[in-house]
């Protein structure tokens, strides 16, 4: 088995060292004898989601995220089809808010891709940056547990 990981726009979305997430995945796959390669996409590149097994979408500053959001809207239908067909997306930091319906910044509300029915709001007095806990009525399992199970499956069962 050989996996292909697509890293979307690491030149713009690498605020908290998301290249480290790629390095960690690659090392864990190597330990398990799974061959993998990474393709980094810049904002002007065409993305063929059919070639990707995992997509990483990192976080960036508001300016960079708005640039990326506009680009992702151009390829939204292909990205959404990838997700709906069972494609794996690891959205970190601000990357996950781009997938939702909208998110708020100091400049106002930014329309997202609406691939996932979520939205994020900025804190009243300051930006909320830290680990999060989510609640969902979709399952008795917490979202955090679901994410851990998905990643566990990816890295241990292949």
Predicted features along the sequence, with ranges:
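Fold-independent oxyanion-binding glycine-rich loops
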Residues: 8-10, 41-43, 58-60, 92-95, ...
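N-terminal beta1-alpha1 cap of cysteine-dependent amidohydrolase-like domains
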Residues: 1-84
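A broadly tuned "polar low-complexity/structure-edge" signature
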Residues: 16, 23, 128-137, 156-157
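Generic structural "secondary-structure junction" signal
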Residues: 15-18, 51, 100-101, 115, ...
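Cysteine-nucleophile active-site neighborhood
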Residues: 62-140
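Conserved beta-strand scaffold positions in the cores of enzyme catalytic domains, especially
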Residues: 38-40, 115, 145
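Catalytic beta-strand/loop cores that center a nucleophilic Ser/Cys/Thr
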Residues: 135-158
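Residues that mark the start of a beta-strand
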Residues: 2-4, 112, 144
